[in-house]
């Protein structure tokens, strides 16, 4: 029986598409500057958008003057990124179709009364299907408004006990442990979802560390933010400040943002420079720069690191209410990150959230509800 072979990928278009389908092959320095990894394992090439079109430093483009696979890959990636940016609008999920037959010919059909909440029921006028949809809050005993109110109260500064008392005034009898369970469940749901959304962050990032208590022991929270939009990019908790390898923080930021910053601003911690050289530095120009702000005075980068200190202040205030964290892998810090990026408006951004400054619009009066519904629907 004759052997059959898979067809070879021969055209530049196919090779370019193959590059985009592999993770970590294209790194964006800015909107018009990219680095594409060599597919033969020999370093990388610079792809740049100019007034005369796209240019690449690879031999195929330099010698033949053709649109190489690296340019094609960047253009495909660029088009996809622009399409995603243009459509990153999260709206509240509204029931419009029957889950059985798909028709839009539905109408409300009474209320289902549970012990702690009421759920709207619907009927399909075509197939007769009766249904209720509670996206993101299925099998939950309490009203979604009570759950999201608890998250708003907690992340805006209230303790679990005070949140419990506030909910009681609203008619929701719930234990502080149940509230803690809600926070864990929905924080992880939202964080997993928003990490897949590509925020349009700037090209200057800042990293800093702050000490926190976990089970009474001193730990350090390392955080990475975008200077322009205040978007909190990444975080990690370390046992030590000076012995910690910050490469994990920078690597996570690079992976989530799908780019390398033009400038990284940090304090004088040596591990930052080591991590920068490992994760961000390249011989390909334009090279990313590491600015040690603590050594600079009267400098454009050294604004006393105020933008970073604001996040540190938020964490400090939150930690006082929590009286310390219980475990290193706590979801609370991730919840604070979601709250900071998507819920809390910032005066320095003219009342917008960092996510809105990055082109991600979360609509609806209850943004917690919108995020949870969209995250649940995307699973």
Where are these regions (language model features)?
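Long, low-complexity, compositionally biased intrinsically disordered regions
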Residues: 1-123, 169
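Active-site beta-loop-alpha junctions of metal-dependent nucleic acid enzymes
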Residues: 140-142, 235-257
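Short glycine-rich loop/turn motifs
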Residues: 44, 217-223
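C-terminal domain-tail junction helix/linker
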Residues: 317-379
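Short, positively charged, Gly/Tyr-enriched micro-motifs
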Residues: 116, 120-204, 209-216, 229
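RNase H-like two-metal-ion nuclease catalytic core shared by retroviral integrases
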Residues: 117, 292-316
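Acidic/histidine-rich, metal-coordinating catalytic segments
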Residues: 260-272
